[in-house]
């Protein structure tokens, strides 16, 4: 990796970064330090490629923390941050490890979150 970095073909980020118009890279800790979650904004909505922050549509409860998250308390806080924004901004969350549910909006119900309306990724324009 050092050779790739030295060649200028790898750019490391230390803060949330705008990659280009419509694509922001945001950092989330917990599963691993500095996990990148791309936020893709279209005229219709923002899509969140959540990686391991919310791996499955059924893991919307903030208390559902993966056993392999290296920092579970941090993971809980980061998951809450992502879910709060997704619910309030009506963002579409893409579940990277879910074989059955590809993408949904998120709805807050009392102190918990759940997958709400399915969103087709074919509609991204």
Where are these regions (language model features)?
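Active-site-proximal loop/helix segment associated with metal-binding centers of metalloenzymes
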Residues: 1-15, 36, 53, 57-65
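Metallo-beta-lactamase
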Residues: 1-27, 76-90
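Histidine-centered divalent metal-coordination motifs
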Residues: 31, 35, 97
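Cap/insert and terminal regions of metallo-dependent hydrolase folds
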Residues: 39, 43-125
